Curated annotation (Swiss-Prot):
Residues 1-16 form the signal peptide. Disulfide bonds join 30-482, 68-293, 80-92, 113-155, 297-321, 489-493. The gene is HA. It is found in: Virion membrane; Host apical cell membrane. SUPFAM superfamilies: Influenza hemagglutinin (stalk) (SSF58064), Viral protein domain (SSF49818). This is Hemagglutinin. One of its GO terms (biological process) is virion attachment to host cell. Belongs to the influenza viruses hemagglutinin family. It is a single-pass type I membrane protein. The chain crosses the membrane at residues 531-551. HAMAP family: INFV_HEMA. Homotrimer of disulfide-linked HA1-HA2.
Length: 566
């Protein structure tokens, strides 16, 4: 029996020596790339969904919920609209001579003075907003023969009747209202904005009581323009106890030009001018609170970071902002194609290269080597190819941001009712621009993703070809990203292959000799394990048959006695 056990042990040892990976005269070297268990899906030109190891979101889809007061100068309109602050509504006196980068109008803002309308409200609002200041300068207009500084109970300042502080309500003096003809030259080197108005009484009696004449007229002109307004006497809806109205108009006087005002009644005269400045100031309607923080980009929803090239928070923006697109998400690949590692590598734990799958757990680089030799197994990253890929991918995000960030704000656009067709056309144009930008954004990201994946695949192939050129006939390409090395290759030898100092000639004779000693037929990697198992099973079966035959022979000779008891 001891002899049988000894023979079985010797047989198993011989069999074990023939298993893959146990031949000290060969080694296996595989090349592979980084992989993660769960990658990120991105779009490319050729594939709607391809998994990569890492990706960056390009669409900013949320705001901070507050408007940052830095670096832009924010002026909170509170209860006042910009036009009320411009006219000098008594409850907006705190805004006189204020300056801003962005004027924030609130939904709670209201007028609390004489009822008025501005026929070209949007243009005036935009002009003043872009000027960025309510800086006002009084001028000495000569209104001889009329009473100045009219007021109304609809416009209270404390307990007293008042009026817009930037306007001068003129009405009759005693029983006369002479024809007014006043000029004011612009001798400065900047544009001046004059605000004036026309009063529309609710009844003929109110008209004559204030202006004597049954019908007034106001003409304001410069060398470049002229406006003549005839008051419309008649009742209107009651506002703050009044059914009369004031229409507000405005005139810009260029340097060297002259302002001429001619009227025989109903004139709401200017007290001076606003200095017009050119700049990038703007206005925005928002109820977001103003907070102490820093952000270059502001939307009505609040400030947003501008570290991404696109946003879908709001179409209205101020500052250096990401481009508005319709998509909720656009992901830029910043890693390579992800092929998760298979958890089992055959029944003998063989290693595999990049052709079959990626490698998880590579923390030192994107590309690397795994080896199996007489000293065991090991893994190391290839820093050169990793750095080459990273250098080309780095800066992709910044380049996309540079291509897409708005350098100027997207202002709110308003049109009066009579300009409805213009508004519809403008909306169509704006929607078309957004559709176009959304398409361009998706195409741009898909192109960049395709380039990234092709680039990282190329670096893997370059590393593989570099290794092949070093090994030459000393090794065989196994077809799965691995090389079978036909000479003894310890860890120092493997290291020389990785760092490019491998000397092919040193191992050439040994490799050729080992090639000739290999069996004539070498099975492919997919079937080898199964054949070995079958061979092992047959060998064990034959061993059992031999053992059983020996026992039966011994029983016949009388050397072994077998008793069967029932």
């Amino acid at each position: 029996m001891k002899t049988i056990i000894a023979l079985s042990y010797i047989f198993c040892q011989v069999f074990a020596q023939n298993l893959p990976g146990n031949d000290n005269s060969t080694a296996t070297l595989c090349l592979g790339h980084h992989a993660v268990p769960n990658g990120t899906l991105v779009k490319t030109i050729t594939n709607d969904q391809i998994e990569v190891t890492n990706a960056t979101e390009l669409v900013q889809s949320s705001s901070t919920g507050r408007i940052c007061d830095n670096p832009h100068r924010i002026l909170d309109g509170k209860n006042c609209t910009l036009i009320d602050a411009l006219l000098g509504d008594p409850h907006c006196d705190g805004f006189q001579n204020e300056k801003w980068d962005l004027f924030v109008e609130r939904s709670k803002a209201f007028s609390n003075c004489y009822p008025y309308d501005v026929p070209d409200y949007a243009s005036l609002r935009s002009l003043v907003a872009s000027s960025g200041t309510l800086e006002f300068f009084n001028e000495g207009f000569n209104w001889t023969g009329v009473t100045q500084n009219g007021g109304s109970y609809a416009c209270k300042k404390g307990p007293d009747n008042s009026f817009f502080s930037r306007l001068n309500w003129l009405y009759k003096s005693e029983s006369t209202y002479p024809v007014l003809n006043v000029t004011m030259p612009n001798n400065d080197n900047f544009d001046k904005l004059y605000i004036w108005g026309v009063h529309h009484p609710s009844t003929d009696k109110e008209q004559t009581n204030l202006y004597v004449q049954a019908s007034g007229r106001v003409t304001v002109s410069t060398k470049r323009s002229q406006q003549t307004i005839i008051p419309n006497v008649g009742s209107r809806p009651w506002v703050r106890g009044l059914s009369s109205r004031i229409s507000i108009y405005w005139t810009i006087v260029k340097p060297g030009d002259v302002l001429l005002i001619n009227s025989n009644g109903n004139l709401i005269a200017p007290r001076g001018y606003f200095k017009i400045r050119t700049g990038k100031s703007s206005i925005m309607r928002s109820d977001a609170p103003i907070g102490t923080c820093s952000s270059e980009c502001i939307t009505p929803n609040g400030s947003i970071p501008n570290d991404k090239p696109f946003q879908n928070v709001n179409k209205i923006t101020y500052g250096a902002c990401p481009k508005y697109v319709k998509q909720n998400t656009l992901k830029l690949a910043t890693g390579m194609r992800n092929v998760p590692e298979k958890q089992t590598r055959g029944i003998f734990g063989a290693i595999a290269g990049f052709i079959e799958n990626g490698w998880e757990g590579m923390i030192d680089g994107w590309y690397g080597f795994r080896h199996q030799n007489s000293e065991g197994t090991g893994q190391a990253a290839d820093l050169k190819s990793t750095q080459a890929a990273i250098d080309q991918i780095n800066g992709k995000l910044n380049r996309v941001i540079e291509k897409t960030n708005e350098k100027f704000h997207q202002i709110e656009k308003e049109f009066s009712e009579v300009e409805g067709r213009i508004q519809d056309l403008e909306k169509y144009v704006e929607d078309t621009k957004i559709d176009l930008w959304s398409y361009n954004a998706e195409l741009l990201v898909a192109l960049e993703n395709q380039h990234t994946i092709d680039l990282t695949d190329s670096e893997m192939n370059k590393l593989f070809e570099k290794t092949r050129r070093q090994l030459r006939e000393n090794a065989e390409d196994m077809g799965n990203g691995c090389f079978k090395i036909y000479h003894k290759c310890d860890n120092a030898c493997i290291g020389s292959i990785r760092n490019g100092t491998y000397d092919h000639d040193v191992y050439r004779d040994e490799a050729l000799n080992n090639r000739f000693q290999i069996k004539g037929v070498e099975l492919k990697s997919g079937y080898k394990d199964w054949i070995l198992w079958i061979s092992f099973a047959i060998s064990c079966f034959l061993l059992c048959v031999v053992l059983l035959g020996f026992i039966m022979w011994a029983c016949q000779k009388g050397n072994i006695r077998c008793n069967i008891c029932i």
